[in-house]
Amino acid sequence: MSFLSRQQPPPTRRAAAACSLRQKLIFSPGSDCEEEEEEEEEGSGHSTGEDSAFQEPDSPLPSARSPAEAEAERRRRSPGAEPSSPGELEEDLLLRGGGGGAQAAGGGAEGDSWEEEGFGSSSPVKSPTTAYFLGSSFSPVRCGGPGDASPRGCGVPRAMDDPCSPQPDYPSTPPHKTFRKLRLFDTPHTPKSLLSKARVIDSSSVKLRGSSLFMDTEKSGKREFDTRQTPQVNINPFTPDPVMLHSSGQCRGRKRAYFNDSSEDMEASDYEFEDETRPAKRITITESNMKSRYTTEFHELEKIGSGEFGSVFKCVKRLDGCIYAIKRSKKPLAGSVDEQNALREVYAHAVLGQHPHVVRYFSAWAEDDHMLIQNEYCNGGSLADAVSENYRVMSYFTEAELKDLLLQVGRGLRYIHSMSLVHMDIKPSNIFISRTSIPNAVSEEGDEDDWISNKVMFKIGDLGHVTRISSPQVEEGDSRFLANEVLQENYSHLPKADIFALALTVVCAAGAEPLPRNGDQWHEIRQGRLPRIPQVLSQELTELLKVMIHPDPERRPSAMVLVKHSVLLSASRKSAEQLRIELNAEKFKNSLLQKELKKAQMAAKVAAEERALLTDRMATRSTTQSNRTSRLIGKKMNRSVSLTIY
């Protein structure tokens, strides 16, 4: 659509002051406005070319007229209708000029430069009439008919009305295809960004993912969630990959919630996304309003132990009738340093699961700010109790029992280290004894102890100092069993610190004097010297214990090497796995011998065949020579000579 804009000469007097900047729009042939003009002509049936607000470019342009001439022209078109005041005349001119009537053609002196959207300047020209139009509260009034004497009667029917209607309707808005194309406002609509639709996030604005795809959420009443109401959970730091629990498993699974059109908002989405991905707050050990689970589910039989952390009670569970060991903290742990140790023990138990040489964990809960842990009950008590009893009666663990202790606890450490964890508090009071006559089943590693070992099972317990090998948070244990490198805060060989403590534990079980907590003797032990043992041990076992407390942690054997040491695997104590290994080795040797035997047999057979073939060849050669001799003719014989003479 093309435009021709002609600036009229500045008018004079009051009309010039009111409409000094308006321009007339003249459309070129073939424009869309000609269709409007045709529709207006069809609707009115009597409008002429001079009644149209749009003129052909070849038609003569009206010259500037005075206000008196404009008033006379309006009186001529609407007889009997006189404006009461110049202000009313201006209002009438504005309405009729915007409506496309003849007054628009005759009011060239009042025109602004009204431009079509997308052409010319990007902002309209503000004129006094435009300001008057915006400031007033009137609306265009429909005419009662062509003969209406009101000054607001426009006399121009709407193009969309039926041309056959005797009383055609008149437009209540300027008869333009798009009202906004007239640009009668001072400024265009400000583009709204996504941020302009921001609203305060509440639980009612966040819908479940995908709820708006298949049904109306308002009608369906689909349940909603609030990220602030999400139940809190603890994050176990001893799982194989604790970081992926929030970045992989949750960030991928939970995405931003969908918002409806009225509340769609990037800031709200980002706020919710950050709230979702933020690590969950840790649940602390607080007072519970629930009824005591300890008294409800368990019946306390006796107190079987006490330590720095708390007391251990022997209890029977009312539901299954089995005996369990319930550890209860002595004092409230909420907000204390011991709270982290209690949680660390629960985390470690949950990750390690079930192993024949680790005390089994069942459950844990908090009551009145106290932590309670339900563990496996070991009927033999702790190794410390056994050592104390032996010391009282002046008896000791035999060498066979010491080897069994070293082997079983070594297997437990091998399992803990395989989970990338370290115990960091191996000592006699943390090793428990379970006496049973039931043969032990094959463990996860395929190890099965013999009947003697099954009568006494040594299990590692008290996991309050467990930490990860890769990212250690070391809480130093008993100084009597603490390796020197840990005291120096060298955490590069933490599994070897458990080996060091295990060697001293075996020394205590062998009958040695109580270990020092500090002093010269303490440093002598860290230099690789064993404490004095009141019984005579084999040289092999003594050397093994010395290697286990070597000052250089790299020289100490790992738990994997320890459980396969030849000293611990005697003929009467070899595991089924070791016996199978030896059996397979013997089978392999037998197979090699069988192959060698087959090769020797094949070689002998080939040699016999070669000898037989050689004999046949010799016999064939002699027979051939004899045949040749018998067929020879003329040897030692007179040959007949015939001669013919012609």
Curated annotation (Swiss-Prot):
List the signal peptide residues.
Answer: none
UniProt region (Disordered), positions on chain? 27-174
Residue spans of biased composition, Pro residues class: 165-174
- The entry marks the following residues as binding Mg(2+) 2, namely 341, 464
Q: Where is the composition biased (Gly residues)?
A: 96-110
Positions with a binding annotation for ATP: 304-312, 327
Its catalytic activity?
L-tyrosyl-[protein] + ATP = O-phospho-L-tyrosyl-[protein] + ADP + H(+)
Phosphothreonine modifications at: 187, 190, 239
Which co-factors does it depend on? Answer: Mg(2+)
* Compositionally biased intervals (Polar residues): 120-130
Annotated compartments: Nucleus
Q: What is its main location?
A: nucleus
Q: Where does Mg(2+) 1 bind?
A: 430, 462
Q: How is its activity regulated?
A: Synthesis is increased during S and G2 phases, presumably by an increase in transcription; activity is decreased by phosphorylation during M phase. Protein levels fall in M phase as a result of decreased synthesis combined with degradation. Activity seems to be negatively regulated by phosphorylation upon entry into mitosis, although N-terminal phosphorylation might also regulate the protein stability via protection from proteolysis or might regulate the subcellular location.
The Protein kinase domain is annotated at 298-568
Q: What is its EC number?
A: 2.7.10.2
Q: Name one Pfam family in it.
A: Pkinase
Q: Where is the active site?
A: 425
Give the co-factor note: Binds 2 magnesium ions per subunit.
Gene Ontology MF annotations: ATP binding; magnesium ion binding; non-membrane spanning protein tyrosine kinase activity; protein kinase activity; protein tyrosine kinase activity
Q: Which SMART domains match?
A: S_TKc
**Which segments show compositional bias classed as Acidic residues?**
32-42
Q: What does this protein do?
A: Acts as a negative regulator of entry into mitosis (G2 to M transition) by protecting the nucleus from cytoplasmically activated cyclin B1-complexed CDK1 before the onset of mitosis by mediating phosphorylation of CDK1 on 'Tyr-15'. Specifically phosphorylates and inactivates cyclin B1-complexed CDK1 reaching a maximum during G2 phase and a minimum as cells enter M phase. Phosphorylation of cyclin B1-CDK1 occurs exclusively on 'Tyr-15' and phosphorylation of monomeric CDK1 does not occur. Its activity increases during S and G2 phases and decreases at M phase when it is hyperphosphorylated.
Q: How does it assemble?
A: Binds to 14-3-3 protein zeta.
What the record says about family reads: Belongs to the protein kinase superfamily. Ser/Thr protein kinase family. WEE1 subfamily.
Instruction: Report the protein name in the record.
Output: Wee1-like protein kinase
